[in-house]
Amino acid sequence: MLKTINPTQTQAWNALTAHFESAQDMDLKDLFAQDAARFDKFSARFGSDILVDYSKNLINEETLKHLFALAKETELSAAIKAMFSGEAINQTEGRAVLHTALRNRSNQPVLVDGEDVMPAVNAVLEKMKSFTDRVIGGEWKGYTGKAITDIVNIGIGGSDLGPYMVTEALAPYKNHLNLHFVSNVDGTHIVETLKKVDPETTLFLIASKTFTTQETMTNAHTARDWFLATAGDQAHVAKHFAALSTNAPAVSEFGIDTDNMFEFWDWVGGRYSLWSAIGLSIALAVGYDNFIELLEGAHEMDNHFVSTELESNIPVILALIGIWYNNFHGAESEAILPYDQYMHRFAAYFQQGNMESNGKYVDRNGNPVTYQTGPIIWGEPGTNGQHAFYQLIHQGTKLIPCDFIAPAVSHNPAGDHHQKLMSNFFAQTEALAFGKNEETVKAELVKAGKNAEEVAAIAPFKVFEGNRPTNSILVKQITPRTLGNLIAMYEHKIFVQGVIWNIFSFDQWGVELGKQLANQILPELADGSEISSHDSSTNGLINAFKAFKA
């Protein structure tokens, strides 16, 4: 079990509070000027393909000393061991947390309730390999004897965000199959997708552990009805639908052959499920071997996380720096900014990963916390973001720590595109860190021919204060393996922060109330009768909706 230590009651927290009084005046220009080796001291390499530069943060050696002390005092190392050893650290649901077992390429035993889960994990992987080989190779035929050309993954949350993010990030490795993802219960999503595919050559993956998820099953039934409108015979469903689920009776009743049902386990959380059978769409998109490379990459980061001392542990360092901003500097959000168009859903994926994990106000003792927990996560690819929201990051009143991610080698080395992209990547972190003072601004204006009055009028608006913190994560190239490294790195960062904040990171009770109320409201929308059973606002909205529809 995880310890229940209030971080604010630790000696390290008190030391950080005292340290912050002087640290508020830290200036990155001074920190770099005072230490020519700062980059070397505050950067880390992961293997030969990833460099993490955290030198442009508002930290010094004393800051890190206290942060590592906080990690030790909250018994982080014991928590890491507890997770990897299969303890039921998801205590509110009584479950182990073992997405790491899904990518345990060492195949060393991982025990849950005394039973090694690896034989079951490997059996599902073998089943996925056989299935993907048949579909990709054209051996799997539709009801008219044609090979499959399109895959439609129907899921929501972790059953959609992860596979979609990865298949987009690994698009350069894509084979001939066309991938489509449907998640929203808004009928527009499924209807627009079905316009693009042919029932004779489309395979649907229904991703729902329970096979009862409202949004997923609504879309699944619509897809089946659309398919049968052409195929006619219910028996043909088995050739065009597969299930990522554990509910065999419901899968069979839907018309899916349970031989084409791919299982996963209750110790796999939805937002960590891309490593499981939920990743079948990934394997179909890029091939089984590349899917295994993705798992290998994540396993490499798992090994680093488990075996590396805290002071050199990349996910731990990133997590602690995040706590420094969240709990001491008062930062409310973090931006993830990948300078790679293929990674355009990476921030959205970790928006769920972080905010669903650590968006909690009750600690592991069951008491409301008296400190900040999970940050708001957001971001877009560069350079698009530069022309959208970087203005606020540079000159706004909010402190927004940013992670900049970029590959050194592009999959599309067209002309000088990548050099221009990377020049912006390097320039932005430099500009955020060091800014431009008023003296420099005025000198530039004078050089541009402005008179003294014009200089005085415009100069204040062109000043960049700098001192905006960033991490730079430079990757040799985005490959299945390095993408696996990156995803696991962020997963473990989230876990570390949850441990230190004394919250449960692997449940998500906050999604339940809205579902319950929606189920109560749904039958009230069936006719035109006036509703009065809710508060005046909800009643008014429902009745206005009915009036608009009438």
From Swiss-Prot:
Claim: Ribosomal protein is one of the keywords in the record: no
Keyword Cytoplasm: yes
Stored Pfam families: PGI (PF00342)
Reactions it catalyzes: alpha-D-glucose 6-phosphate = beta-D-fructose 6-phosphate
Enzyme's top EC category: isomerase
Source species, domain of life: Bacteria
Protein name: Glucose-6-phosphate isomerase
